[in-house]
């Protein structure tokens, strides 16, 4: 009887690497939104722990998070707008972010476009008072005049140009006269959109006027004090203030 190898009996494999949990080398950090929003806690993010020359803070800085404005404002009416937040500073386990951009969801944009009306768009590059260079995109649609019988609401080319000019003027005026934080406060309640709608009534009535997108083109040199001010923190030294007191000479009783 020939004695051969039993293939069913497999020998134990040597030199197998021990499986390591990749999450054991990572840490969770809290993402904090600026004070211009109602809800400050955006969520958490993972990063590799600091080892050797690789610093966790350097890996976190520059990360961009896209968050629904409905979550930041606790209001479902803002669900179609997305805000981009960029990590500029890491303090302890908190990532301090700043406004990086705004956009509409694609389903909202598609729902606005309809037949029998004119779509009017405009964009402009503006610089805020704190030297942030932004590109703002506005969108609006013509609507039926009161007591109009005609089915369509098409605007003439001259009217479109006049409306576009108004859009550019209002966006430039409102954005160039305030800081980035103040502009964010204008964008949340859609102040600019309502202003455009009101000022163009004499040219052609508009509806669904929005600043649909804000793109950050260039940011100024990083200022830690300004960022901490946005997050309601202070970069000042907490050593205390000097208190002036009147000097009183102590009189020793003779023994």
Curated annotation (Swiss-Prot):
Name the source's superkingdom: Eukaryota
Matching entries from PROSITE patterns are given as: RIBOSOMAL_S3AE
Q: Where in the cell is it found?
A: Cytoplasm
Cellular-component GO terms for this entry: cytosol; cytosolic small ribosomal subunit
Q: Main localization of the protein?
A: cytoplasm
Which UniProt keywords are present, listed alphabetically?
Acetylation, Cytoplasm, Ribonucleoprotein, Ribosomal protein
Instruction: Extract the GO molecular function terms from the UniProt entry.
Output: structural constituent of ribosome
Q: Which InterPro entries match?
A: Ribosomal_eS1, Ribosomal_eS1_CS, Ribosomal_eS1_euk
Q: Name one Pfam family in it.
A: Ribosomal_S3Ae
What GO biological process, any one, is recorded here? translation
Query: Membrane spanning segments where?
Result: none
PTM-bearing positions, type N-acetylalanine: 2
Annotated signal sequence range: none
Family label: Belongs to the eukaryotic ribosomal protein eS1 family.
Spell out the subunit comment.
Component of the small ribosomal subunit. Mature ribosomes consist of a small (40S) and a large (60S) subunit. The 40S subunit contains about 33 different proteins and 1 molecule of RNA (18S). The 60S subunit contains about 49 different proteins and 3 molecules of RNA (25S, 5.8S and 5S).
Q: What is this protein called?
A: Small ribosomal subunit protein eS1
Provenance organism: Phaeosphaeria nodorum (strain SN15 / ATCC MYA-4574 / FGSC 10173) (Glume blotch fungus)
């Amino acid at each position: 009887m020939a004695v051969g190898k039993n293939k069913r009996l497999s020998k134990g494999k040597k030199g197998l690497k021990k499986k390591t949990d990749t999450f054991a080398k990572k840490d969770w950090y809290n993402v904090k939104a600026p004070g211009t929003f109602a809800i400050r806690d955006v969520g958490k993010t993972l990063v590799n722990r600091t080892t050797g020359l690789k610093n966790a803070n350097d890996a976190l800085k520059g990360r961009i998070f896209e968050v629904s404005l409905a979550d930041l404002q606790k209001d479902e009416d803002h669900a179609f707008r997305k805000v981009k937040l960029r990590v500029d500073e890491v303090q302890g386990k908190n990532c301090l972010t700043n406004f990086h951009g705004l956009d509409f969801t694609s389903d909202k944009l598609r729902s606005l476009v309809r037949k029998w009306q004119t779509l009017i768009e405009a964009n402009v590059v503006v610089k805020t008072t704190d030297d942030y260079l932004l590109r703002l995109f506005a969108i609006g649609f013509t609507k039926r005049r009161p007591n109009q019988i005609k089915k369509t609401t098409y605007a003439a080319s001259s009217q479109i140009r006049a409306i576009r000019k108004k859009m550019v003027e209002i966006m430039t005026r409102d954005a160039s006269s305030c800081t980035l934080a103040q502009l964010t406060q204008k964008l949340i309640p859609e102040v600019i959109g309502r202003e455009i709608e009101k000022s163009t009534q004499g040219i052609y009535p508009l509806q669904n006027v929005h600043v649909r997108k804000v793109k950050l083109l260039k940011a100024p040199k990083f200022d830690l004090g300004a960022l901490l001010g946005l997050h309601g923190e202070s970069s000042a030294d907490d050593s205390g203030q000097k208190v002036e007191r009147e000097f009183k000479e102590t009189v020793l009783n003779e023994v």
